[in-house]
Regions:
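PLD/PLD-like phosphodiesterase catalytic module centered on the HKD motif
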Residues: 4-147
Length: 147
């Protein structure tokens, strides 16, 4: 999954968690810094719990990443929806779901290429953050239903 704004609602968080616990390889690619500090702070609060259950979270370092894609086996999704409540409940979004091995393979290859410009989130990375940053991220998480 590639998304510029990752502030998942409970159903998405549960789906990612249960998939990882079942042994499914789940990887998420987000920008290291987005154009919204609040969204970036809120997103970081989800990383630790996802990594603990086996989800691999990658932070894209090169520039602002704005792709919105998902690949599951031979199924690919490309669209305008971010992985956040605003896209799920408020904004008018569109997505194309394509059952095509070639397109899914192409998107998976692009994902792998983007990983070359990314750093994988590790549990100790989040724990090394200063107290003020962890506090601001926790505050942002409280606002996540509105983001």
């Amino acid at each position: 999954m590639t998304t510029p704004y990752f502030v998942p609602n409970e159903p998405l968080l549960l789906a990612l968690t249960t998939a990882a616990l079942r042994g499914v390889e789940v990887q998420i690619l987000v920008p290291q810094r987005s154009d919204s500090r609040l969204v970036t702070a809120a997103a970081r609060t989800y990383f630790e719990e996802l990594v603990r259950v086996g989800v691999r979270v990658h932070q894209y370092e090169s520039s602002m990443l704005h792709a919105k894609t998902l690949v599951v086996d031979n199924l690919a999704m490309v669209g305008t929806a971010n992985m956040d409540n605003r896209s799920f409940r408020l904004n008018f979004e569109v997505a194309a779901v394509l059952l095509d091995e070639g397109i899914a393979g192409s998107l998976a290859a692009t994902f792998q290429a983007d990983l070359q410009h990314s750093v994988e989130y590790r549990l100790q990375l989040g724990q090394q953050n200063p107290v003020w940053q962890r506090l601001s991220e926790a505050t942002a998480r409280l606002l996540s239903p509105l983001l």
